[in-house]
Design a protein with these regions (language model features):
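Catalytic palm active-site di-aspartate
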Residues: 1, 31-36, 63-73, 99, ...
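Conserved pre-catalytic core of RNA-dependent polymerases
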Residues: 1-147, 151, 483, 492, ...
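Catalytic palm subdomain of template-directed nucleic-acid polymerases
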Residues: 72-89, 174-206, 223-224, 261-263, ...
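Short, conserved micro-motifs composed of acidic
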Residues: 113, 211-248
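Basic, alpha-helical interaction scaffolds
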Residues: 238-314, 332, 367-380
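Extended C-terminal regions of large enzymes
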Residues: 320, 335-508, 512, 698, ...
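Active-site metal-binding core of divalent-cation-utilizing nuclease and nuclease-like domains
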Residues: 507, 557-614, 630
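Domain-level recognition of nuclease-like catalytic cores that cleave nucleotide substrates
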Residues: 652-706
Length: 706
């Protein structure tokens, strides 16, 4: 069923009002973490649950647990009970009447198809169940199920994490149940108490017309910290909640458990699923950027969901990062010699945007530590106390967090970096809540800067005349296909397997260029300085792609018929009554030009306005774009003066279009492009240049870049 957008907006507003009312009046029980704001939901419940299991095991205590699952819970809750609960919780009468009137309008069409035709029942009224796609329905369900929490707590049965010998203190801190939406887990110190709690839950459920899904319900009995075989609990004649067998686990909120959490098995299961998803994403036809996004959103959460619940030794975290990079390299997403720190930086800063598992783990621990210290939940405070006093350093969230904080503070003191003014507006808040991530990113930038090979490009991007945002636009947009992105990043990092690189690694004796056999073969030499590649036309083809795009935009602006940009073939002379466009053609100047510079890439002569533009394009090495601009402006000054006199112009300008071979741009490039008719897009100029560089490198290196 498709829910109208207007209805979603309206129910969202109503949901906010109801939640605010419930929160102010403290009507909802803390045990329910579904729809609770400023809480970590399932992670909150799993923290408490894991501490109960750990406490029971360490102190050899008795514990009886039961997992209760409802059969089609969302579709079973009666509308009449929801309306009754709205009265109980003193919801505003207009809101209650609106919800009631909407429920009365809920209908469905039923069609039964058979061999002789079909039977159609229109407008069948719906008296049970709620939507599963709007903002209000989950909150209504939590309101309808909340009285169950109150009934369970009245029994004063449960498990206490409080070590006090006073019965009064233990009763005060009893944990009788945990509830997330309809996922219910019950706790008692013996089977008799558990049976009583199950009886309360069953009676309540039966009264409001909800049924247990017995095939998904189970119980577990622990005596003196060890699992024992218990008896099945009969809830009705012939209906039992079965005792969980020793070799069987129950999946509670996504985490398998029995009498304890088997951390080694859980780690291996998470690792296997993560690797499976990672390989599946890498084998897909997605672009490199979308592959990284898919890994961050679909693979990393398999691991991060259990951080803080499942014990992860640091060596396992590190090995997963290594395994990830190895798989990405095998599937040609990463290049084996590229700067690793760039892989984990955001794309807007020139990285690839991959989440490092080590960062995700440490940030999760620090965030949970902050959550434990700031959340006013009595059960969670007992969890914090247990982590601080009882658990080993490798399992304790506060202790691990202190280690990680100390580590990143030392790194930050050693590597002071100036943050750019382009940081997000909520930088201070992020720094307080997620300090490790913030400082680790600065640390990665520092390591990139100090890298002997990759640091050269980083230093170039930090120069005052460089357009940082524009220079990384190609990687942020992620348009390069298959292995092109990794090849270009490796070229920026001077990490391609050139002869110079192989000699530096001790693999080759000769470092001379495989084409010209004169200069040392480096990435910079291959992309812009090899005489043989120049003679073979590799640089010219790249240069002409940029010129062709600029020529196409000028023609479009002047109303000259053109094909699509990828089919455009510039002619030496293109003219209308008012405009003449010269392309790669010698311009008769009418007088001697001393330096012989009479053949710019494009000349636009507008007779009507008596103006002209001399446009010359260059795609030099990234480290030479400033020099190339000066050379172009100086080179055509004589031609500019000659044409001004010859054509009797009022205005004539030299427009240098300089783009680095791997995409680096000056901050004044946009101004130059804006002065060209049609205003060519800076990004399109960049992408034309870097695609030419990628094609050049593939042909030059052959199989050596694989």
């Amino acid at each position: 069923m498709i829910i109208p957008t207007t209805y979603n907006l309206l129910t969202g507003i109503i949901s906010d009002a109801i939640y605010h009312h419930l929160d102010i009046q403290q009507f909802m029980e803390e045990e329910q973490k579904g729809c609770r704001r400023y809480r970590q939901g399932t992670k909150h419940q799993l923290l408490i649950n894991s501490c109960i299991l750990e406490d029971c095991k360490q102190r050899a205590r008795n514990l009886s647990m039961a997992w209760v699952d409802y059969k089609k819970a969302y579709d079973s809750v009666p509308h009449s009970w929801i309306i009754r609960c709205l009265d109980i919780y003193k919801i505003s009468p207009p809101i209650k009447e609106f919800i009631k009137s909407q429920m009365q309008r809920w209908t469905m069409n039923i069609t039964l198809r058979h061999t002789n035709g079909e039977i159609h029942l229109p407008d069948v009224k719906v008296k049970r169940g709620i939507f599963q796609g709007d903002s209000l329905s989950p909150l209504l369900f939590c309101i309808a199920i909340d009285p169950l929490s109150k009934l369970i707590k009245k029994e004063s049965i449960g498990y206490s994490l409080n070590k006090s010998r006073k019965k009064k203190d233990k009763v005060k801190d009893l944990i009788s149940h945990l509830l997330f939406m309809d996922d219910l887990k019950l706790y008692a110190e013996d089977e008799k108490g558990l049976e009583k709690l199950i009886e309360v839950v069953h009676e309540f459920s039966r009264d409001i017309g909800m049924e247990f899904g017995l095939e998904k319900c189970a119980k577990c009995t622990i005596k003196k910290g060890k699992k024992v075989n218990g008896t099945n609990i009969e809830i009705e004649e012939g209906q039992f909640i079965k005792d969980l067998e020793s070799d069987t686990n129950y999946i509670y909120l996504g985490i398998e458990e029995n009498a304890t959490l088997e951390h080694k098995k859980l780690r291996e299961k998470a690792r296997t699923e993560y690797i499976r998803r990672l390989k599946k994403i890498c084998r897909s036809e997605l672009s490199p950027k979308n592959k990284i996004t898919a890994i961050n959103q679909m693979a990393i959460p398999v691991l991060s969901y259990g951080f803080g619940i499942i014990d992860w030794p640091q060596k396992d975290i590190d090995s997963l990062d290594v395994k990830t990079r190895k798989i990405l390299t095998m599937h040609k997403v990463l290049y084996r010699n590229q700067c690793l720190d760039r892989v984990y930086l955001p794309r807007r800063e020139g990285g690839m945007g991959l989440i490092e598992i080590n960062d995700a783990y440490r940030n999760a621990i620090i965030s949970l530590d902050f959550y434990l210290k700031t959340t006013p939940d009595k059960h969670l405070q007992n969890v914090k106390k247990q982590h601080q006093e009882d658990l080993h350093q490798n399992k304790s969230i506060p202790k691990l967090a202190d280690i990680f904080k100390t580590a990143h503070e030392q790194v930050n003191n050693n590597n002071q970096t100036n943050e750019t003014a382009s940081e997000a507006p909520d930088q201070e808040q992020c720094l307080k809540l997620y300090p490790y991530l913030h400082h680790e990113r600065a640390s990665k930038r520092e390591r990139w800067k100090t890298n002997k090979r990759a640091g050269l490009f980083y230093e170039e991007t930090q120069k005052s005349y460089i357009d940082q945002k524009g220079s990384f636009q190609w990687i942020q947009n992620g348009e390069l296909k298959f292995d092109e992105e990794r090849l270009l990043i490796a070229a920026q990092d001077q990490g391609l397997t050139t002869n110079g690189f192989l000699k530096m690694c001790g693999i080759r004796q000769d470092d001379k260029c495989r084409f010209c056999h004169n200069a040392t073969e480096s990435t910079s030499h291959l992309v812009s300085a090899c005489k043989i590649l120049l003679a073979d036309g590799h640089y010219t083809r790249r240069h002409n792609k940029v010129c062709s795009y600029i020529h196409w935009t000028i023609c479009r602006d002047k109303g000259i018929p053109t094909k699509e940009v990828w089919l455009h073939e510039p002619q030496p002379v293109t003219a209308t009554d008012d405009v003449t466009i010269f392309y790669d053609k010698e311009i008769p100047a009418g007088r001697y030009i001393e330096n012989g510079a009479i053949k710019p890439d494009i000349v636009v002569w507008d007779r009507q306005s008596r103006s002209a533009l001399i446009i010359d394009v260059s795609v030099p090495n990234d480290f030479g774009i400033n020099r190339a601009e000066r050379e172009k402006v100086t080179k055509y000054q004589d031609l500019k003066n000659a044409l001004k006199d010859e054509w009797q112009l009022k205005d004539i300008a030299v427009i240098p279009v300089i783009i680095g071979a791997t995409g680096l741009m000056k901050d004044n490039l946009q101004c130059y492009l804006d002065s060209i008719p049609g205003m060519p897009k800076k990004y399109q100029v960049q992408i034309a240049a870097i695609r030419g560089t990628v094609s050049l490198l593939k042909q030059a290196l052959g199989t050596h870049f694989q």
